[in-house]
UniProtKB/Swiss-Prot annotation:
Source species: Mus musculus (Mouse)
Lineage of origin: Eukaryota, Metazoa, Chordata, Craniata, Vertebrata
Pfam families: LRR_6 (PF13516), NACHT (PF05729), NLRC4_HD2 (PF17776), NOD2_WH (PF17779), PYRIN (PF02758)
Protein's name according to its UniProt entry: NACHT, LRR and PYD domains-containing protein 9A
Family according to the record: Belongs to the NLRP family.
Gene transcribed to yield this protein: Nlrp9a
GO-annotated cellular components: cytoplasm
LRR repeat feature ranges: 695-716, 724-745, 752-772, 781-802, 809-829
Length: 949
């Protein structure tokens, strides 16, 4: 039986006579070819009924059925049906638009907080609005647009305005026939749903069927917001589905839509906050971005004038502008409303205006207390506490359950009476949303949820609400969840200043206990084995500390850490980092990564609003960066011994400031890693000069274009008797054999250097021969030489062999990824068997030798008593060759402890042989990439950063 989805098409086929219907089917045999689709078999449609044919059309040609039918009506001379169908469809589309217009006009008028008059709002969003129009006007193909920006910056409001304007025929009329707006967090409690059911839930009566609507998906736009509040994760999936009729877990439906598996021809307009941006972006195909940048200075002035009367508004605007940190907060529309509301309440009570401060915890508390006093100023604190606690319980229960829309049962269950609800609505703590209730802004739900723990610290059993320790676990263990945004408020409210505001109104506040619990948790976090090298994104901890700023508390927290990895991804991160690290006296090892985009934000107007940074004094730190204070902050940490800036682009000026800080007597850094910092040969000279009298013993400059000129400067440093450098890492530095000439002299005069890494440079045999001349000199004390990927051949093995037989200092030699071949390996084996050879670690991985060398290598294993580690990875030898090696490994004279081999590349028989050797020889480990971890650590290379770089 025909379901309702195909009824619209069927009613028109019913108007065809039998003879017309037969001709219709005959033309249908060729019609799909016009759409580049496969035709339905004639045997399936020859005798089919009209009802069955509709089902087949929707099944075989989803999204194209109506286009085909309208074309076929013309071919059977029923232009009247084609015209009638198109007219009726337009009428139904018009009715849908009218329905959406009325719906969103109500939402816009009653439930949307624009904070400014409509005319001014249009000016506020002019740039973003024009960008939205341009994107869809220029692109005929499906487009995915992401609206991003700070919390409370107006993203959701912008999308509601776009929906209202489309329904009012003022936006994208020629592009989209249907636009659907969904807040995805409303799907949190739905287990399974089809996209068809989701769309149907928004349609008024007498609408087109879902099949008809989706018959032209390129004319459909989905507007989706609320991703920050989803209970479930959306991630790259393989179990996606293209059937929009099929009932599926809601996360599969959303992922399939976002990843363009379901309805790939439709367009998407998404609101993504900070909590969801990094998770959702990887799912999208070539997304375009529109950024909501907040209020301009002019908009703030308009807002103040419209919020107060004209003269008062002008005065308040001037006062706000004179307090730069506070004025910068006003750029966020929601915070601007809070600040002005607070001032208005204080004016009405003729109170002295509060000093707002610059922390969010303090700002929200001043706002809440001012609002509360406007109604309950004379009530006893015990009564006030009981009343506000009901609102806090509603908020925190919602957070734990991930519920953001409440009904009357939710309010009653948490003790909120009808009279209290009216007060909360009047205070703008809550607002109506249809027949339900939501917090006036999502951040207010976070605030009252956190306030719950200050009003009721002692554990009370609740089936849903977790205690403070559990809350901290949710914030830091799971990171991106519904608690993501509360972490700053929790720290910001745990201050004596906030305590002094709350206690007169609500009685005793548990600020001290909350601080102690935070310290206990951070202590446990810093001591966990898995966090031995704690990776800190400033937003996760430093911003929280910055919102507290109580010196004793901050130092108690930062005193817990001895090693940190800090990833700085924007200017705000840069402003928070030095404040916190300056209060971390025990940090010994610091991995610091400043993403390239940070410097673009500072210097390039296209990547950031420089005026905004200046107004908010956010640039003070970045300006100080140029004066060297950034490095002073880090390098003057009393216990700091290890500093890693891998991946941070440093200009010559920045390098100069860094080196100036290194020269201070208070700097005790012994390991300095500057890999991939875009350091030039000129900057290398600056570094070399600064290290002559420093305490730096380990220097990594890998992946920098130092060239031969830069190495020449380093060699001058090495020749200075005051230089105490022991390790120098120079892989991927664009060096040639000429650099080896400079190093020759340095190796003969430096007594401290024990490790030299020259991997992946174009040294060739000529360069290595020069190094060998130095190594044969008894004055050369080098212990490790890394030469992987240096374009060596078997020709240089003669000189290397001579070194092995006369130099007893050299213990490690890495020759991997060179074209040494059988001839070279055999020559090296002769030297390794020499009684004077004391080699301990030898790398021959990827050296293009065969099983012909295995007999020679086997002899080395039983002859060279000092050899402990041998890397033979990625070489082509067969089972017979492996047998010879294993026989030697089982020999009592073999002292090898590490053998580099990828066991998975060998046959099952060979793997069994290796396993037997490992079982017999308990001291031996057969490993793939046996030295990779050590090499990356010494070079300071970070493989993965949590960044958008």
């Amino acid at each position: 039986m025909m379901d309702s989805s195909g009824y619209g098409l069927l009613q028109y086929l019913q108007k065809l006579s039998d003879e017309e219907f037969q001709r219709f089917k005959e033309h249908l045999r060729k019609e799909p070819e016009k759409f580049k689709l496969k035709p339905i078999s004639w045997t399936k449609i020859k005798n089919t009924s009209k009802e069955d044919l509709v089902m087949q059309l929707y099944t075989h040609y989803p999204g194209k059925a109506w286009d085909m039918v309208l074309s076929l009506f013309l071919q059977v001379n029923r232009e009247d049906l084609s015209t009638m169908a198109q007219t009726e469809r337009r009428d139904k589309q018009t009715k849908y638009k009218e329905f959406m217009k009325n719906t969103f006009q109500h939402i816009w008028t009653m439930e949307t907080n624009t904070y400014i008059p409509d005319r001014s709002y249009h000016e506020f969003i002019e740039v973003q609005y024009r960008a939205l129009q341009d994107i869809f006007d220029c692109e005929s193909e499906p487009v995915t647009v992401v609206v991003s920006g700070s919390r409370g910056g107006g993203k959701t409001t912008f999308l509601r305005k776009a929906m209202l304007d489309w329904a009012s025929r003022n936006l994208l009329q020629n592009r989209f026939q249907y636009v659907f707006h969904f807040s995805v967090f409303s799907l949190n409690n739905i287990t399974e749903l089809s996209l068809a059911e989701l769309i149907s839930s928004t349609l008024p009566e007498s609408s087109e069927t879902v099949d008809d609507i989706l018959s032209d998906p390129k004319r459909i736009l989905f507007i989706l917001d609320g991703f920050d509040y989803l209970k479930f994760d959306l991630e790259l999936r393989t179990n996606l589905c293209n059937d929009w009729r099929k009932k599926l877990p809601i996360q599969i439906v959303l992922s399939s839509l976002l990843q363009k598996i379901m309805l790939p021809e439709c367009s998407l307009l998404l609101e993504l906050g900070n909590a969801s941006l990094s998770n959702i972006i990887p799912l999208l195909q070539y997304p375009r971005e529109i950024i909501m940048s907040g209020f301009s200075e002019q908009t703030i002035e308009i807002y103040c004038v419209s919020f107060f009367n004209t003269q008062t508004g002008v005065e308040i605007f001037k006062n706000l502008k004179s307090i730069k940190p506070l004025f910068n907060l006003c750029r966020c529309p929601h915070l601007c409303w809070m600040i002005c509301s607070t001032i208005k309440w204080q004016y009405e009570r003729r109170e002295v205006a509060s000093r707002f401060g610059r922390t969010l915890g303090l700002l929200y508390t001043i706002f809440m207390v001012s609002a509360f006093k406007s109604t309950y100023a004379r009530n006893p604190s015990k009564q006030n506490r009981a009343r506000i606690r009901t609102l806090c319980t509603l908020a925190v229960e919602g957070m734990w359950k991930q519920v953001y829309v409440f009904d009357s049962d939710d309010l009653r269950r948490n003790g909120i009476s009808e009279s209290d609800k009216k007060v909360w609505l009047r205070m703008k703590f809550l607002q109506n949303q249809g027949s339900n209730i939501v917090f006036y802004h999502s951040t207010l739900q976070w605030y009252f949820a956190v306030l719950f723990y200050f009003l009721q610290y002692k554990d009370t059993r609740h089936p849903v609400i977790g205690n403070l320790a559990q809350l901290l676990g949710e914030i830091y263990a799971h990171k991106q969840n519904q608690w993501f945004h509360t972490r700053i408020l929790l720290f910001g409210m745990a201050t004596e200043q906030v305590n002094s505001l709350l206690e007169p109104c609500f009685g005793c506040i548990s600020s001290k206990e909350v601080r102690q619990e935070i310290i206990r948790y951070i202590k446990s976090l810093s001591q966990q084995e898995c966090n031995e090298k704690l990776v800190v994104h400033p937003q996760n901890l430093f911003f929280c500390i910055l919102d507290n700023q109580e010196e004793r508390f901050v130092r108690q927290l930062m005193d817990r850490f001895e090693e940190m990895t800090v990833d700085i991804s924007d200017v705000d991160d840069m402003s928070a980092t030095p404040y916190c690290l300056h209060r971390a006296p025990k940090v010994k090892n610091l991995h610091l990564h400043i993403q390239k985009r940070v410097f673009l934000e500072i210097h390039d107007p296209e990547y950031g609003d420089l005026e905004l940074f200046k107004l908010g004094q956010k640039c003070s730190f970045t300006t100080n960066f140029g004066d060297g204070l950034l490095f002073c902050t880090f390098l003057h940490l009393p216990h700091l011994k290890y500093m890693n800036l891998y991946g941070t682009n440093l200009s010559n000026d920045a390098v100069e400031r860094l080196c100036s800080a290194l020269k201070f007597s208070t700097c005790g850094v012994e390991e300095l890693l500057l890999g991939k910092c875009d350091i030039s040969s000129e900057a290398c000279g600056i570094i070399a000069a600064s290290l002559i009298n420093s305490e730096v013993k380990h220097l990594s400059l890998v992946e920098n274009p130092l060239k031969n000129k830069g190495v020449m400067s380093l060699c001058e440093m090495l020749k200075d008797p005051s230089c105490v450098l022991e390790s120098l890492m120079l892989s991927y530095c664009c060096l040639t054999f000429i650099a080896c000439g400079h190093l020759y002299e340095a190796l003969l005069s430096n007594e401290h250097l024990s490790l030299l890494d020259l991997g992946s440079n174009f040294l060739e045999d000529t360069g290595v021969n020069l190094l060998c001349e130095a190594l044969k000199d008894p004055n050369c004390t080098l212990k490790e030489l890394w030469l992987p990927g240096c374009y060596l051949t078997s020709e240089c093995c003669e000189e290397i062999s001579a070194v092995l037989t006369c130099n007893t200092n050299l213990k490690t030699l890495k020759l991997g990824n060179n074209n040494i071949q059988d001839t070279g390996v055999k020559r090296l084996c002769e030297a390794l068997c020499h009684p004077n050879c004391e080699m301990q670690c030898l790398g021959l991985d990827m050296c293009d030798f065969t099983s012909d060398c295995c007999e020679d290598l086997a002899l080395v294993l039983t002859t060279c008593n000092t050899l402990k580690s041998l890397n033979l990875d990625w070489n082509a030898f067969d089972h017979s060759g492996l047998e010879m090696l294993c026989k030697a490994l089982n020999h009592k004279a073999c002292n090898l402890e590490v053998l580099g081999l990828d066991k998975s590349l060998f046959s099952e028989e060979s793997q069994t042989l290796l396993q037997a050797v490992e079982k017999k020889n308990k001291n031996l480990k057969v490993l793939h990439f046996p030295w990779l971890k050590e090499e990356l650590e010494k070079r300071g290379v970070r493989l993965v950063w949590n960044s958008k770089n």
